[in-house]
């Protein structure tokens, strides 16, 4: 397009998806973007829903929208559920030689407290570590960030406050020490390991309390305090749904890359060969008998018992609780006494 008398302004607003990902009030978002006066917006990780939200906020008429591929083929994805997460982390770093090599990596933690603890412990292990979170002074954050970018420190331990605008090409791994609250955040942060196109690893350590912590953040919703009550409710429901999708990612036995790409609306192969699930052989087991027995056992109970109690019933347990509450009279008692129920 050639316009002799018209100046075309092209500015990329970094991560437009943040408009809705963080619950920014619509009017505030419109005012902010209007002040920028840009004619070109860009975002790296937006679902179809978020793209529609962005177009609505900008009030664009007949906009040209181009969606490129989300796949980052050089990234290896893995989800692990270690019993001792810190021990697993140290073992990984030493196995890969990050205690002696000059390669860089990022470890994301959910809270400032975790950042402080992990960075302190790794430093004591002899790793070249720095840290970043909103609780540090501006001066210290700037110094720590520059030490990481320019190679004075190899490992950055940080909350999600770190990363905006960072384009360090030689990041070889991104480890999520805790599960983030949504797939958008996860993929954005994991993508900081792919900038030079070389093979890199993205590992997520899952533990159940991550779900509770994220739910607490969502329930509190301090960043949504400017919204009216009805909008806050909508935002909270949306955020809880995204948390659920993030949790599903941690438990799927399917290709992790396929799960990610499908989440962002992109079709992909069911086998990528470059994620832990694709490199793991899952055995297909028929558990119809076990499932039906447990369901019938639950139907026969007149009270809500925990999973451990139900397992004891179908296994034929003889504990004081089972016998004292006459749970041995359940029609499914001991039906699975010879079977293993996880």
Q: What do the PLM-derived regions correspond to, one by one?
A:
Residues 42-46, 81, 136, 234-238, ...:
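Catalytic cores of large soluble enzymes that bind and process phosphate-bearing ligands
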Residues 239-267:
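C-terminal accessory regions
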Residues 1-230, 241, 266-270, 277:
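Helicase motor core with emphasis on the C-terminal RecA-like subdomain
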Residues 213, 224-228, 238-239, 258, ...:
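Accessory DNA-binding and partner-docking regions appended to nucleic-acid-acting proteins
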Residues 25, 88, 245, 293-296:
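Pre-recognition alpha-helix immediately N-terminal to the DNA-recognition helix
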Residues 93, 148, 250, 298-302:
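Short helix-to-turn junction characteristic of helix-turn-helix DNA-binding domains
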């Amino acid at each position: 397009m050639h316009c002799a008398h018209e100046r075309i302004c092209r500015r990329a607003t970094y991560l437009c998806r943040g408009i809705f990902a963080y619950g920014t009030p619509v009017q505030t978002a419109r005012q902010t973007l209007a002040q920028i006066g840009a004619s070109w917006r860009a975002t790296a990780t937006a679902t179809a829903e978020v793209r529609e939200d962005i177009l609505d906020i900008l009030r664009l008429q007949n906009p040209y929208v181009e969606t490129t591929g989300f796949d980052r083929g050089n990234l290896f994805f893995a989800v692990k559920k270690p019993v001792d997460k810190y021990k697993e982390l140290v073992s990984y770093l030493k196995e890969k030689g990050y205690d002696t090599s000059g390669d860089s990596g990022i470890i994301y933690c959910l809270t400032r407290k975790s950042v402080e603890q992990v960075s302190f412990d790794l430093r004591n292990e002899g790793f070249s570590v720095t840290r970043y979170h909103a609780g540090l002074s501006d001066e210290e954050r700037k110094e720590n960030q520059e030490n990481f970018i320019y190679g004075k420190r190899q490992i950055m331990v940080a909350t999600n406050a770190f990363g905006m605008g960072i384009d360090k090409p030689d990041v070889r791994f991104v480890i999520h020490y805790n599960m983030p609250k949504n797939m958008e955040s996860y993929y954005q942060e994991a993508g900081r390991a792919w900038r030079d196109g070389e093979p890199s690893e993205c590992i997520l350590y899952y533990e159940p309390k991550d779900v509770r912590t994220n739910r607490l953040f969502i329930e509190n919703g301090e960043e949504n305090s400017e919204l009216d009550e009805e909008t806050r409710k909508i935002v909270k429901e949306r955020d809880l749904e995204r948390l659920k999708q993030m949790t599903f990612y941690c438990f799927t036995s399917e290709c992790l890359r396929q799960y990610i790409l499908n989440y962002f609306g992109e079709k992909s192969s069911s086998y990528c060969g470059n994620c832990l699930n694709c490199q793991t052989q899952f055995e297909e087991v028929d558990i119809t008998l076990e499932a039906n027995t447990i369901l019938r056992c639950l139907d026969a109970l007149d009270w809500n018992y925990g999973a451990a109690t139900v397992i004891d019933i179908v296994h034929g347990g003889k504990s004081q609780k089972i016998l004292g509450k006459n749970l041995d009279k359940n029609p499914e008692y001991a039906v699975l006494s010879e079977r293993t129920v996880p």
